Amino acid sequence: MINKDIYQALQQLIPNEKIKVDEPLKRYTYTKTGGNADFYITPTKNEEVQAVVKYAYQNEIPVTYLGNGSNIIIREGGIRGIVISLLSLDHIEVSDDAIIAGSGAAIIDVSRVARDYALTGLEFACGIPGSIGGAVYMNAGAYGGEVKDCIDYALCVNEQGSLIKLTTKELELDYRNSIIQKEHLVVLEAAFTLAPGKMTEIQAKMDDLTERRESKQPLEYPSCGSVFQRPPGHFAGKLIQDSNLQGHRIGGVEVSTKHAGFMVNVDNGTATDYENLIHYVQKTVKEKFGIELNREVRIIGEHPKES
C-alpha cells in the first residue's frame, strides 16, 4: 500500500511528472532484474534532490540513489522508500582544460567530449558504462587509469540534504572506494582537470582500449559488469577460471565463458540467481585457493517474499 502522505509531500517538492509510484526497477539495470520502488523520482535540478533528501531525512524515510544501473543488482523484493534517479542531471560543460559533468552524465560521453576538445586524461573511461556519480562513488577505473587521477572536486549532498564540495584529497579515493560510500553522500556533479593533447592520439588510444574491451568482455549479454574486486596480488577472473567455474550456471545466470570476471544473464535470470552464483563462486575460490573475493558490484533491495 503506497503511503499517500509521502506522495502528496513529494508533489510539493518536485513536479508530478517526475514522480512514479510502484515503479519496476528492472527497467533501469543492466542485469534486467529487480523489483519495484515505492517511489521513483527523476529530479532535473540539484535543488530538487536537496529538497527530497531533506524531507526524507526529517521523516525517517529511506532514500536510495540510482545512476545508470551498470554495476548494481536490485533484489526482486524491490526498494522501500524513495529511489532517486540521477540520470537527468546530465550536463557536461568544458572550461579551458576542465570538464564539469552532472552525476547522471555517462562517463563514456564525458570522455568523448574531452576527446572532441583535444583534452587528454579520460581515455581510460571510454568503455566504462557507468555514470559520473557512480564512477566517483567507486573510483571507477580501467586499463591503468582511475577517476582519482583527474578529478578536481565533487559537489555532493549529505544525508541531511546539505551541499558539500569535496576536493580530490577529501574524497579519499582508493581502489573501488571513496568517502562517498563511507559517509552515505551522493554526487551531484564532478569536475575533472585534464591536459591539452592531440585529438588523433587521444582517438587512437580510445580505439585501442575499445577494441581490447570488446574482444575480451561479454557485451552481448546483460550483466552487472565486473563482479569482484581484484584481490591483492591476484586477478579475480584468473582465480575463477582456474577454479573451472566458467560456464557454471545457477538459474538463468552463468559465469561468462568469455571473461570469468563477469556473470551474464543468459536466460531470464533473477537477482536471486546472481546472488546465489556470486556466493557459490566466492565459496569455491576460497576453498581452492584460500582467497576471499570481495564484491565490486552492489546488491541492494529486499529479498522476494516467499509465496
Curated annotation (Swiss-Prot):
Its main location: cytoplasm. It catalyses: UDP-N-acetyl-alpha-D-muramate + NADP(+) = UDP-N-acetyl-3-O-(1-carboxyvinyl)-alpha-D-glucosamine + NADPH + H(+). The active site is at 176, 226 (proton donor), 296. It comes from Staphylococcus aureus. One of its GO terms (molecular function) is FAD binding. One of its GO terms (cellular component) is cytosol. PANTHER family: UDP-N-ACETYLENOLPYRUVOYLGLUCOSAMINE REDUCTASE. Cell wall formation. Its cofactor is FAD. Keywords: Cell cycle, Cell division, Cell shape, Cell wall biogenesis/degradation, Cytoplasm, FAD, Flavoprotein, NADP, Oxidoreductase, Peptidoglycan synthesis. This is UDP-N-acetylenolpyruvoylglucosamine reductase.
